Amino acid sequence: MKNNTTEDLSLIKLPKPVFSHCSTVLEALKMRRTYRAISNKKIPLQILSDILWAAQGVNRVHGPFGGPGRTAGSASNSQEISVYVAKEEGTYLYEPDSHTMTPVAAGDNRSLAIGPGQRTSGANAPVRFIYVVDVDKFKTAGYQEPGLYDLEVQKSYYFVDTGLIAQNVYLATSALGLVSWFHNCNKTKLAKILRLKPHQRALFGQTIGYADE
């Protein structure tokens, strides 16, 4: 890994998502699979844009409680999960409202976006997503249900909300001719590399790419 400053990285403005792909939801479900043998073939920026939008992009300006609505639901529209994108040159934070990728750490951190005992699978994949929760966002959610302040309830919510995003990624990659794999990550090292705050924590990773067949 290189020094994790971001001086050599720039904000990436993603192209608008393309909605003309021919696969239906049922076809994507039929093709959905967890696949670990992923090649190093680069993912075009348009395809990455489409997958990120599917993950948790803005699909309506006025969602629950007045804020923008996203493709993946969340508890009381808390939107407490963020998607980080680990690529060879650096790691970026996906910003749904502007549909951009903001650099947060330079260098190749893809090996940290997977559990220590899983590194040989999909090791050459061009992209790994990292799912990070910010539990403070529960306190500012639109609907202040008492459960949002209960730590165990919070945990159940953010695990489910992460799963909703990950399933969107599974369906998008299936529809676009790619494969993906949802897995663990190196939570301790990612917290340092991504400069996470005490109320943030890395939860899971998801490897994205083309099947190595």
Annotate each language-model stretch with its function.
Residues 10-11, 19, 153-155, 204, ...:
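A short, structure-level motif marking secondary-structure boundaries and short turns
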Residues 144-146:
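Flexible internal linker/loop segments at domain or repeat junctions
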Residues 194-213:
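A glycine-rich helix N-cap at a beta->alpha junction
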Residues 2-127:
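N-terminal amphipathic, basic helical "cap/leader" segment at the start of enzyme domains
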Residues 32, 51, 83, 125-140, ...:
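Small-aliphatic-rich amphipathic alpha-helix that forms the alpha element of a beta-alpha
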Residues 1-2, 197:
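Secreted/extracellular ectodomain signature
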Residues 75, 181-182, 198:
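Short, surface-exposed helix-loop/turn micro-motifs enriched in polar/charged residues
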